[in-house]
Structure formats: structure tokens, C-alpha cells
Amino acid sequence: MEQEQDTPWIQSTGHINIQKRENGQQTLKLEHHNSIQLMDHCPKTMNRAVMLKQTVCWRQWLFLRSPTPVSLKTHVLRRWKSFSKHGWTN
């Protein structure tokens, strides 16, 4: 009897490449620098925790790239509160 094999495939949206490995795991590769378009193209089946983590990382990257005075003030205040509770951590 022939056993069905899981063959690798790649689906490209132009902004996100989704690659399925032989073991069934999917990997995402983001290839666009516009957060709105990235979020529009994210698969609906993605785990909410993974999506939240990716969103937080993306926002941090955008902040480091071009901080505004308000976001910089917020960032400094959060770090100061964290320092006063726990001490500095890198």
C-alpha cells in the first residue's frame, strides 16, 4: 500500500511567503516594510499569541526606526517605571 507523503510547497502573496515543510510546519517570511499591508496578508489561522508577538516585535522595530517625541517619552517612562520596580535590565 502506498503511503501519502506531505510534499513541500510555497505560496507567495507578494508580501509574505508561506513555506510548508515536510513535517507539516509552516514558516512565514515577511518581505514588505508596510505594517498595514503585512497585517492584511497574515493568515487567519495563525495562533493569536504568535500574532501578538509578531505585532509587538514589528511595532518595536518601527519605533526604533523612527521614534516620535510622544512614543519616545512613553518608552522612557515605561523603562523608568520598570527600573524603579526591578532595577535596570537589558
Curated annotation (Swiss-Prot):
Keywords, alphabetical: Apoptosis, Host cytoplasm, Host membrane, Host mitochondrion, Host mitochondrion inner membrane, Host nucleus, Host-virus interaction, Inhibition of host innate immune response by virus, Inhibition of host MAVS by virus, Inhibition of host RLR pathway by virus, Membrane, Modulation of host cell apoptosis by virus, Viral immunoevasion
Residue numbers spanned by region Mitochondrial targeting sequence: 65-87
GO term, biological process aspect, one: symbiont-mediated suppression of host cytoplasmic pattern recognition receptor signaling pathway via inhibition of MAVS activity
Compartments, as annotated in UniProt: Host mitochondrion inner membrane; Host nucleus; Host cytoplasm, Host cytosol
Pfam family name, one: PB1-F2
InterPro entries membership: Flu_proapoptotic_PB1-F2
GO CC, alphabetical: host cell cytosol; host cell mitochondrial inner membrane; host cell nucleus; membrane
Site keyed High pathogenicity: positions: 66
Function field: Plays an important role in promoting lung pathology in both primary viral infection and secondary bacterial infection. Promotes alteration of mitochondrial morphology, dissipation of mitochondrial membrane potential, and cell death. Alternatively, inhibits the production of interferon in the infected cell at the level of host mitochondrial antiviral signaling MAVS. Its level of expression differs greatly depending on which cell type is infected, in a manner that is independent of the levels of expression of other viral proteins. Monocytic cells are more affected than epithelial cells.
UniProt record similarity statement: Belongs to the influenza viruses PB1-F2 family.
Subunit structure: Oligomer. Interacts with human SLC25A6/ANT3 and VDAC1. Interacts with host MAVS.
Miscellaneous information on this protein: Is not encoded in all strains, and seems to be dispensable for replication.
Protein name in the entry: Protein PB1-F2
Lineage, top ranks: Viruses, Riboviria, Orthornavirae, Negarnaviricota, Polyploviricotina
